[in-house]
């Protein structure tokens, strides 16, 4: 296996949250292979950029995507975050 991945850490964090909107930062870090602090930073960047919204529900946070927001990649500007998630996340 190569030591690289097709998805950046930001993309992998998005996938973790798409699979479980209530996932904890510690769990994101474990799944992506980054520290909890790095997961916290990435989630904050996604919120600041308008791709993700966080809502406090009791003692936990719940995340929701802004699915119409365009991708930041110059080669994929015509696509939205929703388009990306539709391709990468299997829906039952």
Annotated model-derived regions:
Residues 15-19:
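Short, locally clustered residues in the helix-turn-helix/winged-helix DNA-binding domain
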Residues 37:
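Key DNA-contact positions within bacterial/archaeal DNA-binding proteins
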Residues 56-62:
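Short, Lys/Arg-rich nucleic-acid/phosphate-binding segment
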Residues 70-92:
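Amphipathic alpha-helical dimerization/coiled-coil segments
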Residues 30, 47-48:
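Alpha-helical residues within the helix-turn-helix
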Residues 1-12:
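Short alpha-helical segments that sit at the start of domains
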Residues 43-44:
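Short, hydrophobic-biased segments on the C-terminal half of alpha helices
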